[in-house]
Amino acid sequence: MSSITIRGCCIGAGRPKVILPIVARTEDDILREARRLSALKADCIEWRADWFSDVLDAAARKRVLSGLRAALGEKLLLVTFRTKAEGGETSLTPQQYADFCGTVCVSGCADLLDVEFFPNQEELPALIGQAHKAGVAVVCSSHDFHKTPSRTEMVTRLTAMQQTGADLPKLAVMPNSPSDVLELLAATAEMAEQHPETPVITMSMGALGAVSRLCGETFGSAMTFANPGQASAPGQVALDVVNEVLDSLSLE
């Protein structure tokens, strides 16, 4: 599996990098949480902008992005607008989504931008090109909150995301049996072994899939989301547990 380095953080090599989400409604609460999370043992902070009550206000977006960058220092900042169709709080029109991504890219504050794969097929080349021109890495994401596709389908989806030019394909699926969790792990290992052009981020959601968030170094998932107090997705494990298990399972 290849790796990318951002702000000295090597994603795709060694211990999976830990991401902490910020899910807050107001500018003050977002920045207060950012200051709290900046002191914790994690590599990256994700701003879930779909939770922000003023997300349609471009000036408010810019203020939050600037405040986040100041609060986080050298921690990585991932900016995500998760649409309702992909498990988020709300949705935007295609133009609103493009405007949001544009604000993130030109702000100079974000290190990574999440771009959803399925809702944005036609716009993906332009969105990814804009991000790369601004020096922002792209996480291309896909979520299934109902089931786990076959291993073949998951690998096909991840390789399709690679082919968009995204830096980090991300796949999150819902297991309905232990075998589903194994399928996700097998697909992850296949990507690392047979399609190593980019690092990937994968997870099996819910309590049943929680183990997948802890064994990324073994199977090939480059980053994992931890719960710093309020989870942004089902099955996120508490930060102290994540760090303890990642250290225990380290291959180095």
Segments and roles (model prediction):
Residues 3, 14-133, 143-147:
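Active-site beta->alpha loop and helix N-cap motifs at the rims of alpha/beta catalytic domains
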Residues 102, 112, 117-252:
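Catalytic alpha/beta core domains of metabolic enzymes, predominantly
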Residues 7-13:
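Short boundary motifs at domain starts and secondary-structure transition points
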Residues 1-7:
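Short beta-strand/loop segment at the start of cytosolic alpha/beta domains
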